[in-house]
Amino acid sequence: MSKKINSAILFCSIVLTYSCSITANISKYYSENQKILDSIQHSYNEQYRRRPFSIQFTDKTFTNVSIEIFTDSLKYIYEFIISEARMKDTLLKYALPVADINKLISQMASIHCTWINNLDYYVNNKKESLIYMSIRAKPFNYPFTNKKYYILTYFLQPQYYDAEGRLLDRRYRKKIRKINEDVFKRITDKVAYTISDRFR
């Protein structure tokens, strides 16, 4: 019995240490990369206002990119090798600025951001939006888990968090808000994170 108790205590200590390590690593990562992360968020937000779209890298070398472009009634999905002429022609067709999109794609590749999109959610029956970024990199391939993606969410308004830093529903402030079934934690008032086994 004593051995079982000691094993349980040891396991809990490992889990607690592991959890603290994740939080520390992600906070450090955000601090070190805040300038480029914020630049990606700002650039994507600006271009999204012109035409709703999302960007996804489809290979581990970050050379193939899929762009989803939304019109009033349809969604078009295109896949390109970065900088091929066909991508430029497609961006021009939908009135998206080629240089700005190329820069955004380059910035995403530099930090292994695999996907960026704009997601809608509702507060008091009012539609709000957030920017959702998925990042896959070696620092987040943690042991004891199959969760490989670091997810960042950028909100337009400051959010509510509980004492443990978990994102709360703005309407029911004691209720944990999940995004894509994941619980998010605070980085800043407007930026939250989670780690996940899926990028979207």
List the predicted regions and their residue ranges.
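Extracytoplasmic electrostatic interaction patches
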Residues: E84, L92-R200
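Generic preference for well-ordered secondary structure
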Residues: K4, S21-A24, K88, R171, ...
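N-terminal export/targeting and maturation segments
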Residues: C20-I105
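Generic hydrophobic secondary-structure signal
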Residues: F11, L37-I40, I187
